[in-house]
């Protein structure tokens, strides 16, 4: 018998993973899912996660098959110096992998299958009309359903968040778009690369031997001015950067706006925001989903601690402790990525200083060690 009930609104990656992991704690989980599954499987984005986060979800999600994830032991960083592309820093792991890359749609399909066989996770495909933070219920038409904890994980923006944050957040509109595509090739591309170009950072994320995803963050004006030829420009850029003779195919070209949004308020009473709604960061550093996974891990640990002590989830210390624990790292990462993006912007006034720093950064091994540790396990407070 499951005495305590958790409601998760949203069936994206964050919502699905949270449902499975929290469902291990002998509670009832109701997962409110989208009625339109077509949109989920049109998500052609690719995500990178750290070694420690990979081990965590592999063990907790019981992922027996390894072919969902492409391991990378190395990531190479380049910057555009006038008309030259210079490799200024490389991160490499010998005994373990630096990161794992997967396609969102493939992992979502797997998570859906896992949830279907879980007796304590119920999928409800109904539209939520309202959420009452004070009394802890959701409204489905005239019906009210009460929960011990309500988790909102409905993407970067949702009207459901408004009753919690009241517009309080650290925000920035970059006036940029992330241009994503899937590239098929016949070359040997096994590891990730990040190119800091004058138009904006471009990432290469392989997810199998003959395919990789690219994410190019570009100015909105540049995109609009070159919209008709953007595919040709992207292909020519990739061929030149990777020194390819040709590519076999480019597909699934999509674009989405880039914003910084760091919530300053995470919860109200027993309602919590989780996932992109809590923190949306620049895709340049690939840390967004790592933060989400560390959030889920912390929430699970706090719930487990409360249940072990025989405490109720409702009106407990859990959400306050979660906020105090996770907000510092989430904000530091978000603002740090923002500063990194500003540093690599094409600015002629700061270019001489930037050039000097990047030409000498390889000498400072401690920077690499610290960066590697933080990107893998986060900032430990």
Language-model segments: residues:
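Conserved FAD-binding catalytic core of PHBH/FMO-like flavoproteins
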Residues: 154-244, 253
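FAD/FMN-dependent oxidoreductases across multiple families
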Residues: 226-309, 313-317
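C-terminal helical "tail/cap" subdomain of flavin- and related membrane-associated enzymes
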Residues: 2, 301-381
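Conserved N-terminal helical subregion
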Residues: 70-163, 172-176
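Glycine-rich FAD pyrophosphate-binding loop
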Residues: 7-9, 20-45
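N-terminal FAD cofactor-binding segment of flavoenzymes
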Residues: 41-79
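N-terminal Rossmann-fold NAD(P) dinucleotide-binding loop
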Residues: 15-16
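Short beta-strand to alpha-helix junction loop
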Residues: 48-51, 92-113, 224-230, 258, ...
